Amino acid sequence: MKQQAKSRKPQQPEYIFQVETLSHEGRGIAHYGSHPDHPADKHGKKVFIRYALPGETVKAQITHEAKRLEEAEMVALLAEPSANRVEAVCPHYGICGGCSMQHIHPDEQICLKQNVLQSHLQHFAGIQPEQWLEPIRSLQSDYRRRARIGVRYLPKQDRLILGFREHHSNRLTSIHTCSVLDKKLSDSLPELRNLLQSLKGKAHIGHVELAKGDYETSLLVRHIEKLNNADVNQLRQFALHKGWQLYLQPKGPESLRRIDEEQGAMRLHYALNAFDVNFAFSPLDFTQVNATVNEQMVQLACELLQLQQGERVLDLFCGLGNFSLPLARCVGAKGQVVGVEASEEMVQRATDNAKRNNLVQASFFSQDLTKDFSHHSWANQGFDALLIDPPRAGAYEIMQYVPNFGAKRIVYVSCNPATLARDAGVLVQHGYQLKKAAVMDMFTHTEHVESIALFEKIQEIND
């Protein structure tokens, strides 16, 4: 570790532990009773130790006590380190709360994430895939193409903090580099902090957002009070110097405006070259932060669905069409892709993206998928295949409708293994079988588990 998040509190006890295994979020697990100094009344109690790895002997300071478990932070490694321990690449690791696994070898991170998915599938649904696919791996650094960065001005010190929240805290820690952020964006952080420090209205800036497309970069400044003309001009000159688009957002998303709109609309772009499609998006639109993993993910989804020319596909939670447009390429002009998304703005974005790529076989509808949608015409047309890419809450409300779609193949893309496992159990009840699954390292060095799963309808045999 490069740094420790906080100085040790003298009143909190320290003990020596033998670390046994890893928790789902990457903390070492140990038990009281493995050392003679342990309190007798705590023998057998579980301890979760931040930064500790299996097989290590560590000194740890207790940070939180509960009836059945305790939490601790490693303060010293007392013997040989685990073979899976590596040096964190970021100087802010241990203070910044963005990454939690930089001390773990990348292969072990992948292994842990697959174990998490496997455990959830077994616990919640009692199933395992017939085949585990090779994980989709990420670059180990410079992989994030967007970030929201907090801003806080300390008037007594006349100092502006630009950074991320500390681990389990609302307090910002100042950063001058970010090893997982796109290198050009990361290298710009000191210059950006100096710019914000020089503004008269710096106390009224809540955060900034950086987003990078294939060809453009945007800087969004969220401010709670109007910025004066001099400040806006300074921001404008900075953006012109960097070749960035500049956006100001004084209130909610509807207040977003681009400065110097004559230079173009509020758009950035990215391409999925394997499908010859190009997407336009706004700085506030949801896009996958990891371009490398996203392209591999979309390719794998299309391969798993084994689409044929002329087939019909339903894409639920379609967003701006990240899956829909490649799916439309796969089914060809005689096929059809129907994308459904709650946000009317994103539906319009997806429609525009389909038009710009001449994909007339893709159509989009706005619908809150947590509500009854059975009366809509698109829901009663029948489909050969279904793709579901829900938020963390999963797609439980949709599961009851799945038999009506008639899909032979379902690809479920998940950012939460618990809700994937829950929904998988319902799909099995509806006669689907989990054929293949893989983890995707969308957020490397963090505990977040992204995954993809293929379900196929079991063929009924008529006597």
From Swiss-Prot:
S-adenosyl-L-methionine binds at Q288, F317, N322, E341, D368, D389. The gene is rlmD. Residues 6-76 form the TRAM domain. This is 23S rRNA (uracil(1939)-C(5))-methyltransferase RlmD. It comes from the Bacteria. The keyword Coiled coil does not apply. It is an enzyme of class 2 (transferase). GO terms for molecular function: 4 iron, 4 sulfur cluster binding; iron ion binding; RNA binding; rRNA (uridine-C5-)-methyltransferase activity. The keyword Chloroplast does not apply. The active site is at C415. Belongs to the class I-like SAM-binding methyltransferase superfamily. RNA M5U methyltransferase family. RlmD subfamily. Catalyzes the formation of 5-methyl-uridine at position 1939 (m5U1939) in 23S rRNA. It catalyses: uridine(1939) in 23S rRNA + S-adenosyl-L-methionine = 5-methyluridine(1939) in 23S rRNA + S-adenosyl-L-homocysteine + H(+). Its EC number is 2.1.1.190. One of its GO terms (biological process) is rRNA base methylation. [4Fe-4S] cluster binds at C90, C96, C99, C178. Keywords: 4Fe-4S, Iron, Iron-sulfur, Metal-binding, Methyltransferase, rRNA processing, S-adenosyl-L-methionine, Transferase. InterPro entries: 23S_rRNA_MeTrfase_RlmD, MeTrfase_TrmA_AS, NA-bd_OB-fold, SAM-dependent_MTases_sf, TRAM_dom, U5_MeTrfase_fam. Pfam families: TRAM, tRNA_U5-meth_tr. PROSITE patterns: SAM_MT_RNA_M5U (PS51687), TRAM (PS50926), TRMA_1 (PS01230).
